[in-house]
Amino acid sequence: MDIIVHPRVLQRHPDLSEADVLSAWENMISFLPRLESSPMRYIAIGSDPRGRLIEMVAQKASDGTWVIFHAMTPPSKKTLIELKFVRR
């Protein structure tokens, strides 16, 4: 499975490296499809090598490559609720 991190992620979040985001994707703790989006996007939380939780949003390109176009740490409260990590 090919995975790429959109360059904008690293520009907007200099506290994250490409390796951090890829590791978090590979070590996903939880993910859900966002059914209302077209093309379908997935929201996920995973941990990087330092144990930080990273929120990610990705979609699958037509060639099967996953493109992570949003990542940040720590995850937002909205994402934690959406993925059932915390209650409202």
Residue ranges and their predicted role:
Residues M1-R88:
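Ribonuclease/tRNase effector modules and their secretory precursors
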